[in-house]
Amino acid sequence: MSMSIYDKIFPPKLLTLPNGKQVSKPRSRAPLAAVILVAMTILSVEVTGFDMGVLVSRIKEFFVILGDMIPPQWDYMPQIWQPLFDTIKMSLLGSFIGSILVVPFAMLASTNIIHSRVVVAAMRLLLSIIRTLPTLVSALIATYIFGLGTLAGTTAIAIFTFAYIGKILYEEIETVDMGPFEAMEAMGATKVRSFISAIVPQVLPSYLSNCLFCFEGNVRYASILGYVGAGGLGLILNEKIGWREYASVGMILLALFVTVFIIETISRAARKRLV
């Protein structure tokens, strides 16, 4: 058996068993991993220009800004309602559109449903390409196409949901019991009809649970899409940070925190019933 360079430098330890037979125990790779990690960290610091001294000396500014946010400006709340509702609407509609549109694509990306390697590879490549596109970039592109406003934000969230749910869904489809599906096909049912009747009931609980989980995250993502003009809380958040009105920023963040907490609580309870 050929030995690696590491094993040649650090020979395996010989152990004697009770029956007298000797076996070799390879040396741990932990020291090598630690050296590589330290080297990569040093290289990253050099490339990025990270300065721990600046971080330590300026960390107090964070607490200064945090102090300016407390207490929040309560009388600014009436101006928050509409952008907050826009954020929720973008998240809900984008999540719904993306999760519905991706179902046929997830079906085409499943190897146990579609036996054409070309089709499966093409669908998975499409989902991978879309998944690598940052939501902010999608929103920025959408603003050039649809203009400023919530339509661009909704489109960006739908694109993200499409890619996120698509990968999870086709992986879930590939783990189902294929017996009912094959039986329906044997009786003459079409592939689509067999999929709807035999596969969908098996993946529906986890599919709905993942959609709810994705919606939770989309509410948070939607709140920053306003930085590229896609509507929602991000618009006024960017404005107030720019004007250094930190008390208003504190009120916006508090409203967002409460909203996300309520949505997550409801979603968590719903997902427990589904799974």
Predicted regions and their residues:
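N-terminal, non-cleaved signal-anchor transmembrane helix
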Residues: M1-F96, V103, L108
